[in-house]
Each structure stands twice: as C-alpha cells, then as structure tokens.
Amino acid sequence: MSRVAKAPVTVPNGVTVTQNGRQVEVKGSKGTLSFNLHALVELKQEEGKLQLAPAKESKDAWMQAGTARAVLNNLVKGVSEGFERKLQLVGVGYKAVVKGTVVNLNLGYSHPIDYALPEGVTAETPTATEIILKSANKQLLGQVAAEIRAYRSPEPYKGKGVRYSDEVILRKEAKKK
C-alpha cells in the first residue's frame, strides 16, 4: 500500500485542475501541463485538494496511484512556482552563450555546439561558465539538463566538464611511477 498516494495534493490559489475522462489538465501562471491517468487510478477533487486512490484494491493499483500523485504534485508545483536547474562549466575555455532559444557551448572541441532549447524551457547565463535552465515541466527540464551535460560529462581526474551545480565529482588520483 503506497503511503505517497494517501497524501492529498494541495492546489494553491490561481491554479485550476480540470479532468476530462483520463486526461488531467493543470493551468497556472507559468503555463498549462497535462497528463493521462492510469486506468487503475481515480482522481477525486475537493476544495483546494486533490485525492488519488486506486480503482481496486491491488498492489499494482496502489503503486500506480503513488506515481500519479507524485506526477500531479510536480505539475501543480510547476505551473505555480516553476522549476530551475543550474549547470556549471568547469575547464579552460569552456563557456556558454544564450541567443534566443539556442545555447551556444564551447566545450573544448574543435567546433562550438549549438543546442536548441525545446518549447517550454528557457535559459540564461549570468556568467560565461554558468547556465540556469527554467521550466514549468520538471521532466522536460531534467531531460534538457541531462542532454547538455552529456556533451562533456565531468571526468574524475581534473573534474573538467559540464556538471550540475549540486553535483559532487569523486576525484581520482593520477597514476604514479
């Protein structure tokens, strides 16, 4: 039995949740997001709260209800507050420049990398070695951050590469003669 599914999702003022069959749509100041409920999950709306419950008592239904509750909570938080992810570029000559919806990355290769941001994600560079990504969609934001990091993931000897700001790189010692 999922403990996550038992907790209600609180809906702040300015956020509306509409359900059309299995489709759930969440609207707020930061945008509109939607997702499909699993067939084993039911959604009940009360004043300022959303309660998810399994359609039938089974282990799989409780698991799906817990997952749906977590996704719905992220949608509500995303359209009301939004999410952000910070990336750091560590290395000589590594820099980033944002031009509209394109992030131009110089990561030590012989050519610059132009990464086109998907719709719903914005980027800014307060310094040349820092990228701040913002979005209402937590899943899309994490995907974009992972794709940018994959161009030059941090190596364990000098720590050079693109890393998340809260990431700790385990360093190795160089081989000695």
From Swiss-Prot:
Keywords: Ribonucleoprotein, Ribosomal protein, RNA-binding, rRNA-binding. Pfam families: Ribosomal_L6. GO terms for cellular component: cytosolic large ribosomal subunit. It comes from the Bacteria. GO terms for biological process: cytoplasmic translation. One of its GO terms (molecular function) is structural constituent of ribosome. Belongs to the universal ribosomal protein uL6 family. Part of the 50S ribosomal subunit. This protein binds to the 23S rRNA, and is important in its secondary structure. It is located near the subunit interface in the base of the L7/L12 stalk, and near the tRNA binding site of the peptidyltransferase center. NCBIfam families: L6_bact. HAMAP family: Ribosomal_uL6_B. This is Large ribosomal subunit protein uL6. The lineage of its organism: Bacteria, Pseudomonadati, Pseudomonadota, Gammaproteobacteria, Moraxellales.
